[in-house]
Each structure stands twice: as C-alpha cells, then as structure tokens.
C-alpha cells in the first residue's frame, strides 16, 4: 500500500514555493549574507557598476527580513567589531528563530565568494524586478481608475509608471550583462 503522507508533503512544499517565491529568494539571500556579511559591500559595488542603487531595506518585502538587513547594514558601517560578530551581537531576540533557520540553511555553504556574489546579484536583480513589475501593475490599475474619474492626477501615475519602466530596463540590462559574464 503506497504511503500517502510523502507525496502530500512534497506537494505542500511545492505549493508554498509557488505561492511565494519572493520570500524564498529573500530568505536565501539573507542566509548567505548572515554568514558572509562582507558580501554586502561587494554587492553594492556590483549594483553600482550596473547603474543601480546599493542594497536597501526596500529590497526586502518582509518586516523581519528588513530588520535583519538593517543589522547587516549597521555592521558594515562600524569598524569596532568583526562584521559577523557585530551582527550576532545586535540581532533582536525575537529574530533569533529566523537567524537560526537562516544559519541552518547555509550550514554547509562551500561556494567561493565570487560564485556566491554572482548568485546573490542575480537574485537581488530578480527581487527588484518582482517589486518593479508589481508597482507597474498597481499603477496601471490606479491610472485606469483615475481616467474613469476625470483624470486630474493621471500625469502623476504616468510619471511613476515611466520611472518603474526605466528601472525595469536597467534591471534587464544588468541581468543581461551578468548572464554574459557567467557564460
């Protein structure tokens, strides 16, 4: 008699991954950065090479992830302690379970820093793309609503849509350059 519990578990995890890929990507990125906080500076430099802004709290959608990234950013801004040591000393108590999960995910992290850097860069570009696409979609709905109500503020929505469209272009160009480097 086949076991029913195994397939249902697999299906359940696939559904969770399909429902929220952004959370999984954020989780992975933080799991690497918590182990190797020095990669934050290197990621910032790479993003700037592509004409993009450095990593920011806004790159993360989830509050816990934002709080943890703020601790990482603070660690990079101080030079009294080793960056990793600083991070672990400043993590709020309520984030300890999240940090333990992150550390467990990357317990056997053995990739060279350059490979991790390229991987993280690609994932942060994806996160920014998800965010920008979501904003463009919302703005289009708002623009349609505004147009139906007389269109007094439509110019604002058009300008914001154009800004996110330019960002999407920049992200696509960066992703293309990155994929050429990896080839």
Regions found by a protein language model. Give the residues of each.
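Non-catalytic protein-protein interaction segments used by genome-maintenance enzymes to assemble
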Residues: 1-80, 100-101, 105, 136
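Bacterial replisome coupling helices
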Residues: 11, 69-183
């Amino acid at each position: 008699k086949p076991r029913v519990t195994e397939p249902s578990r697999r299906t359940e995890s696939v559904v969770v991954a399909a429902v929220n890929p952004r959370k999984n990507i954020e989780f992975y990125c933080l799991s690497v950065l918590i182990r190797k906080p020095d990669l934050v500076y290197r990621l910032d430099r790479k993003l700037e090479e592509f004409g993009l802004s450095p990593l920011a709290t806004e790159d993360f959608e989830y509050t816990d992830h934002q709080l943890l990234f703020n601790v990482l950013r603070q660690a990079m801004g101080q030079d009294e302690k080793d960056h990793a040591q600083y991070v672990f000393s400043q993590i709020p108590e309520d984030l300890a379970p999240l940090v333990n999960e992150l550390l467990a995910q990357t317990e056997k992290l053995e990739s060279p820093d350059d490979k991790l850097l390229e991987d993280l860069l690609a994932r942060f570009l994806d996160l920014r793309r998800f965010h920008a696409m979501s904003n463009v979609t919302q703005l289009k709905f708002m623009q349609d609503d505004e147009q139906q109500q007389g269109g007094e503020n439509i110019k604002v929505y058009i300008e914001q849509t154009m800004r996110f469209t330019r960002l999407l272009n920049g992200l696509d160009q960066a992703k293309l350059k990155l994929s050429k480097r990896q080839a």
